[in-house]
């Protein structure tokens, strides 16, 4: 890798809570799939 120095958190698994406006309750987190109805799918 390029070694920029930014470690992104792992993606949020399906079935776990997510916020469609911020992506998730974990800063920088994102669903492995898509976030709909406040749940990762």
Swiss-Prot record:
Going by the UniProt record, its keywords in alphabetical order are: Disulfide bond, Knottin, Secreted, Toxin
Sample GO molecular function, one term:
toxin activity
Disulfide links within the chain: 11-32, 18-35, 31-40
Please state where this protein is localized: Secreted
Q: Where are the transmembrane segments?
A: none
Tissue and organ expression note: Expressed by the venom duct.
* CC terms in the record's Gene Ontology section: extracellular region
Q: Which domain of life is it from?
A: Eukaryota
Q: Which residues form the signal peptide?
A: none
**Entry remark concerning the domains of this protein:** The presence of a 'disulfide through disulfide knot' structurally defines this protein as a knottin. The cysteine framework is VI/VII (C-C-CC-C-C).
Please report the name of this protein according to its UniProt entry. Answer: Augerpeptide hhe6.1
Q: Which organism is it from?
A: Hastula hectica (Sea snail)
């Amino acid at each position: 890798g390029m070694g920029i120095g930014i470690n992104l958190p792992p993606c949020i698994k399906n079935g776990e809570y997510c916020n469609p406006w911020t992506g998730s309750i974990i800063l920088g987190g994102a669903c492995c799939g898509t976030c709909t109805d406040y749940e990762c799918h």
